[in-house]
């Protein structure tokens, strides 16, 4: 049965595909060259109007590097005035006191800053630029002095797997309000050979569950739908009932929100379930966003757990996990196939 269509909770919007770095794991394979045909300022404002007419989601201004787009502050202010909660994802290297104050004036409520290693060697290797780590830390220091809330995002891969605990400690030392881990999906420049093994994937998520119990900052696993299965398995073992009081926001949501509570909009207006799943839902230059969100075939299928195939289709956790549809697509060409990086066997007690 297809679930009733709700307004999106989050929209990740690639304001520009241009970037000042050359990250090895970049979803969009962004470069310093800005592609032709990106949405104009007027088109961006029209899109915000459309979004605000159907709900008030969190609007994530992303890239590329969104701070390379000259009208980023104008667009952010417009989103804020439309009643959206505007946040911005950055690599942190371009942050200055002046830019931070402009972001504050535009109503941006939080920044996410990417740190992919606990030291310069690992982080710079990810970012494709010597000195990126120090520049990012300098940007974070600007945020700290300005008392501007920020979270740290880390993409987990073989390159930094054994540094995750140290990177988490670094995030706390830097004063982050949250630490989000993303698990590499082989899209764009993301290389399949850099993906962690299914066993390591499971191990890190179990560690994450234990850290959530005692952490004073928010922890969130993204592109890791298995976490919601693990959370329930562990809570059952511990005799804990999952609730907002015990598990916070995670008690109210599910693993993969792609197409159900989340979507990705590219710099040229293309709409996808997420930035890692290249199955086109529509283009906001060609049809209203509401129409795409409510009627796109890929979204309708993703909203129906009965469409899932393989072991995901028979799994008792499919309504809270659903597997990573982008990984299924990368491995098989079918986004409804079973999640290739899950070691769980459905029905196992």
From Swiss-Prot:
BP-aspect Gene Ontology terms: heme biosynthetic process
Gene3D superfamilies found in the cross-reference section: Aldolase class I (3.20.20.70)
Record's catalysed reaction(s): Fe-coproporphyrin III + 2 S-adenosyl-L-methionine = heme b + 2 5'-deoxyadenosine + 2 L-methionine + 2 CO2
Coiled coil: none
Cofactor binding remark: May bind 2 [4Fe-4S] clusters.
Listed EC numbers: 1.3.98.6
Keyword vocabulary terms for this entry: 4Fe-4S, Heme biosynthesis, Iron, Iron-sulfur, Metal-binding, Oxidoreductase, S-adenosyl-L-methionine
Residues of the Radical SAM core domain: 5-214
Keyword Aminoacyl-tRNA synthetase assigned: no
Cofactor(s) it depends on: [4Fe-4S] cluster
Pathway: Porphyrin-containing compound metabolism; protoheme biosynthesis
Binding site for [4Fe-4S] cluster: 19, 23, 26
GO terms of molecular function: 4 iron, 4 sulfur cluster binding; metal ion binding; oxidoreductase activity
InterPro entries noted in UniProt: 4Fe4S-binding_SPASM_dom (IPR023885), Aldolase_TIM (IPR013785), Cmo-like_SPASM_containing (IPR034391), Elp3/MiaA/NifB-like_rSAM (IPR006638), PqqE-like (IPR017200), Radical_SAM_PqqE_MftC-like (IPR050377), rSAM (IPR007197), rSAM_AhbD_hemeb (IPR030896)
Protein family: Belongs to the radical SAM superfamily.
PANTHER family recorded: RADICAL SAM DOMAIN PROTEIN, TUNGSTEN-CONTAINING ALDEHYDE FERREDOXIN OXIDOREDUCTASE COFACTOR MODIFYING PROTEIN
Role noted for this protein: Involved in siroheme-dependent heme b biosynthesis. Catalyzes the conversion of Fe-coproporphyrin III into heme by the oxidative decarboxylation of two propionate side chains.
The protein, known as: AdoMet-dependent heme synthase
Gene name, Swiss-Prot/TrEMBL: ahbD
